C-alpha cells in the first residue's frame, strides 16, 4: 500500500507541475508505471481529445506505451504527436526510439535519502527532516517536435 500511495503522490505532484505550465490541457494519471498502462491512458486521452499534439507521461515506461498507442492508431511520433517521459531511465530494448525525457538526479536523490535515513537513525528532530528539492534536466530525443498544423 505504501508503494502504491507513494507512486500516486508522485504522479499527482508531476501532474500539478504540468498543470502549472499547461492549466487547460487535458490530463489523466495512470494507476501505475507499466508500458500497458501508458497505452491504455494514451488511448483514452486520444479518444477524448483527438486534437492533442503532445503527451507528457509521468514515467518513461508510460511514455513508451503512449508512443505504441499512437503508432497503432497510425499517428507518427513526433510528426503528429510529441511524447515526453519522466525519469531518464534506460529503456534499451523496449523501443527503437530515443525518448525525450526529464532526467532525475538519481545520485543526488540517493545521497539525500541516505542523509535523511541516517538522521532518522540518529534520532534527528522532525525539523531536520524536510522536503528536498532537486533540479532535473530535459534530455531531448526523437519523440518531440513542433506541433502539427491544424
Walk through the language-model features, giving the residues of each.
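Bacterial carbohydrate/catabolite-sensing allosteric modules
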Residues: 1-150
